[in-house]
């Protein structure tokens, strides 16, 4: 009897969460023009599907005005590319008191380890004020997956510096990267990552290639590939791609936005990506 009651209680809890989630979606979307009363009646029992048909173009949201929880909600409902645009930005505060700006660089681009699509990819507009080496020694052995920078970003930096509301909605995604100068690719599952040469420039230049696809933001005409630190100083920045011709360096982007490379033990700027 107790087990039956427990099962029923569990089912009721799931139903309450579903109803609350649907209610939140409807209340949020009603002012945007995406959902009206008829749509609600027709689709309330669907799996959060909203059929737009030939409805007028809805109002887009200003990313800066949305909480990370709201952004995550739109992403979870598959509405991210309807509510926001590539290039939209949102500032957030790190635990050290400094600020970074996150920019949407692509929709429906990255995948979770279970193969499901993760709908929004962000990259920080600025590099961190403090430069970081890719590795403590001058080697690219093991590639991004085995690097010091990857461990730092996904460990202490993620846990200690990012705001709790942002950490709560970041979804780990699979990133492919060459293991070293050879053609072997390995996958890593990352909460935070730096882009590959191909994700920035759309092709391999001095990397091994096949390390992800070109992000929409970087496809656009007149997009500046160069970046500045949080303090405004022009900065080099790391890419996660090992140099295809040696065992000591990784690819980077110089202050002018051109493809370059640096010894793995050199400290360079870090502009990181994440997905929601």
Name each region found by the language model.
Residues 8, 12-15, 19-22, 29, ...:
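Long, heptad-repeat coiled-coil alpha-helices used as oligomerization/scaffolding rods
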Residues 12, 27-28, 245, 256:
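Intrinsically disordered, low-complexity segments enriched in polar/charged small residues
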Residues 18, 38-40, 256:
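Intrinsically disordered, low-complexity regions of eukaryotic proteins
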Residues 27-47:
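Helical coiled-coil/dimerization "stalks"
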Residues 42-276:
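Collagenous Gly-X-Y triple-helix signature in extracellular proteins
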